[in-house]
Amino acid sequence: MNTYFISFITIIIFANGINGTSVDTSNKLLLQKANDFNLSQNLSSSRTRRTIANSFRIVGIRLEDETVETKNGIPTVLVDKEQQFRVFGSGLEENTAITFTNEKNDYGGPCLKPATDLFTPIEVSSNGFSALYSVKFPSFINEFFICAKTAEKTTNHSKAATTTPLEHQGNSDFLKIKTFEPLIPVWLAIIIIVTCLGFSALFSGLNLGLMSMDRTELKILRNTGTEKEKKYASKIAPVRDQGNYLLCSILLGNVLVNSTFTILLDGLTSGLFAVIFSTLAIVLFGEITPQAVCSRHGLAIGAKTILVTKTVMAITAPLSYPVSRILDKLLGEEIGNVYNRERLKELVRVTNDVNDLDKNEVNIISGALELRKKTVADVMTHINDAFMLSLDALLDFETVSEIMNSGYSRIPVYDGDRKNIVTLLYIKDLAFVDTDDNTPLKTLCEFYQNPVHFVFEDYTLDIMFNQFKEGTIGHIAFVHRVNNEGDGDPFYETVGLVTLEDVIEELIQAEIVDETDVFVDNRTKTRRNRYKKADFSAFAERREVQTVRISPQLTLATFQYLSTAVDAFKKDVISELILRRLLNQDVFHNIKTKGKSKDDPSLYIFTQGKAVDFFVLILEGRVEVTIGKEALMFESGPFTYFGTQALVPNVVIDSPTQMGSLQSLNMDSKIRQSFVPDYSVRAISDVIYITIKRVLYLTAKKATLLEKSRKSGTFSSETFDDEVERLLHSITENEKPSCFAQNQSTRRLSNRSINSSPTNMNRSPDFVYNSVDEAIQDDTKLKNIKHADNVTTSISLVAAELEDLHSGEQDTTAASMPLLPKLDDKFESKQSKP
């Protein structure tokens, strides 16, 4: 019997070796127990024992779960949890049922108080040496022993029939199992697991959300953010300033809750399920989701959980604070993100699509960041492209007009060579200069002595901007460089000029165009597309035909007054170009009163009751006007005009169309050819006045029609200029208007031109208008006729009416000068085509 028992112990040890367990201390104890058992059997052989009917015996147990703790060879398991263990012995069969009791007894003794149900084996070895059971131990019992019996066969492995009595298998340590209860209840463990998972998510989110916001960004938000952002940043900034301490506290707290979560979850479950569930829970709910949320809303979440963060920092301070101090010493103080000039410019550029910056604001920021990199040589105007004046120039009307047309307010003045800049002329210096005095520019420059400032071409724009901003050197500087070319000594050479406007243009990355600029860009010479101002230099022209010459200023004033104040000379009747050319004719006169009596006829400009055919505008001096039979008298001064009735009828004149109005032309021809004033105008001081005769006025109107024809493309510019010059210069004060006379062939040409229109196809070739109304009606019907035919008809009609006007005063000889522009061959060929 002893040998039989020891063989079973050897089988148990061998089974442990098969399962990968070496003959350790527990196996040694098992052998020692077997020897003790053999000795006890020999000593008790003389005792009386009852006969055991059963042929099986259990000599040892082993739990299949490797994680179960073993103390002194006795396994310790958790209550109320399914446990699988293997029993070793002999004669084990499928109907060998076991149970557990808390009472000690010898082998073969009765098992009167079983503590668990009967359990049948899940599987049994073929030789009957081992069997596998699944058992759940109840609570409130600390130590269990095995009882067994041969039960009736049943399919339920957890419960067996109870009719056969149970036999105690002994109180050996190899047959003993201890239990323990969990430290906390299951429901409390579940709550703690969920709480740990929540804190794990919070710590993971704060780790990314808070640590991704550097100190510089928080300062920006505290100063420039919205009200909420300022509030949140103010709460976070004190904690974020302790970067390493915050990092260590968050990481330590995260590791703590994750470890607790894993341990508690392992207590509730075991095996592969616990591993998979804990991994998915931590990754999905503890890492990915919170970090995704806090990466976008880290500021708000960090501010609202700041108390939790401070609490964790306080709890983990004994460990996290020393570690953070070590990191501070090793890694240095955290400064935050710092942007240099290039990074700032690139930051503005790459975020242009998502920020609210305007394009001009982006350009200004970029320009300001590049000021230190650009030099004056990059933005200066070359000296050869600058508008300058020679020191020997005279400040006459032509020079001042040239200065005004240049559009500049500061004019460099050079002496001899253009690169020898000696002074500056400001446009305000000309305020008290009379152009009639022909003041030398040198005199004016010596009086004001405006200084000039020179800089080198490698000066950066930020330095120039500061100098211009101070105002000590003005807002213009000349750029010079050292010229060491050649064999001579090096010398300073002026190569260009730079102004405050140039620097500001580089600052805002755009061209500044004010009301006086001629060019959009001085370097590219791109002209500004703007309304063309009047060229006043034309009033300084001197014509030999003029017997009396006046100053250009007075000529300009006369032009402006006539074109704006006198209806007969406004631009819709007489164009500005024609009026300017008209004033270049011999229309200026003067009267000297010295040594003449009051009744001298040469002092009278108009005599009451004496017909006149001219218009008069007083420019200088005083005149006395006597009106009506009552001889009412008053004096008048400059820019008083008389005789407008001699030019136009006293009716409202409609604005002519682009090709002229036949109604207006016919009305001009039908009025009286002379005007009889009911007043007298006598000079009482030296007087300068202009006289414009009716025939010259009609010539100017005809020239205006020609100009409108040129604008519409009927005539070329050369044809127009030649014809206007001939028209205006053909009229002199002593010349009769014979140049406007036409012979019968010219008159017939005019009538033929009218009769050839579609509206007169049914009329006879000798048809002539009998009234002005007929001409007006036909003029309305001529709107759909070809452009060239209309122009020819209108101008021919003017010539015909001029002939009627002077038919009693001139010969019938044809004028030698052509009145109509000579059309080129291409235009004639187009007209000849059907």
UniProtKB/Swiss-Prot annotation:
Gene Ontology CC: one annotated term: plasma membrane
Membrane topology term: Multi-pass membrane protein
Chief place of localization: membrane
Matching InterPro entries: ACDP, CBS_dom, CBS_dom_sf, cNMP-bd_dom, cNMP-bd_dom_sf, CNNM, Ion_transp-like_CBS, RmlC-like_jellyroll
Domain CBS positions: 380-441, 448-515
First and last residue of the signal peptide: 1-20
Keyword Ribosomal protein: no
Observed phenotype of the null mutant: RNAi-mediated knockdown in the nervous system results in a held-up wing phenotype after eclosion and upon carbon dioxide stimulation.
GO molecular function, one term: magnesium ion transmembrane transporter activity
Similarity field: Belongs to the ACDP family.
Assembly with partners or alone: Interacts with PRL-1, possibly at the plasma membrane.
This protein's name: Unextended protein
Lineage, opening ranks: Eukaryota, Metazoa, Ecdysozoa, Arthropoda, Hexapoda
